[in-house]
């Protein structure tokens, strides 16, 4: 993780932290967050820089770009930088370029894509992130909750029943807390709950 912090800094230096002649960053009065929107707009208009942002957890990361051509160049540059600077090879099986307007991309148990949400003032399409639990995560949660329900319905004794109920409640609460930031988590949870309800009714 400490080693890959250098990757974070390098990617940020390509766009987010690129210095400009005039400081166009300011702290918002409502929440104190540093707003770089004016800086980014200026860079888009007056430079040929490739707009990119990195999201990373441990050694799993995504780099987001506006255009496929930028993504192709940045993919190659990042692969070479990791090899030359840190002596690391990327996984050919896990590393690829994805068009989020056409398909989902999985990351840390979520699946993400960009969906059209109206039009900007300049007439171009406006996009927003749509996120769900990943298909793999849904299958895992279904499997584990079914197993927990079975333990509740067939306990060895009352004490074991209380333990099973407590474990089930803690697990469900943990799933809700982890995935609550997904934009469509309610829809995903309803599908899982429907399957679990059927399991309970059939036993």
Give short role names for the model-derived ranges.
Residues 1-203:
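Non-catalytic terminal/accessory segments
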């Amino acid at each position: 993780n400490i080693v890959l912090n250098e990757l974070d800094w390098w990617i940020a230096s390509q766009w987010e932290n690129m210095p400009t002649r005039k400081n166009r960053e300011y702290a918002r009065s409502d929440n104190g967050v540093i707003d770089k929107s004016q800086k980014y707009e200026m860079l888009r208009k007056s430079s040929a820089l490739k707009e990119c942002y990195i999201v990373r957890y441990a050694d799993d990361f995504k780099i987001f770009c506006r255009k496929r051509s930028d993504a192709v160049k940045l993919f190659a540059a990042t692969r070479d930088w990791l090899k030359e600077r840190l002596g690391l090879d990327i996984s050919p099986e896990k590393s690829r370029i994805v068009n989020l307007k056409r398909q989902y991309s999985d990351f840390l148990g979520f699946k993400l894509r960009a969906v059209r949400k109206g039009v900007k003032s300049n007439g171009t399409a406006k996009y927003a992130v749509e996120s769900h639990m990943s298909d793999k995560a849904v299958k895992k949660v279904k499997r584990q909750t079914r197993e927990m329900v079975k333990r509740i319905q067939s306990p060895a004794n009352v004490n074991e029943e209380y333990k099973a109920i407590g474990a089930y409640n803690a697990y469900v609460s943990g799933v809700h807390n982890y995935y609550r930031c997904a934009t469509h988590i309610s829809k995903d949870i309803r599908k899982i709950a429907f399957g679990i309800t059927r399991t309970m009714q059939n036993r």
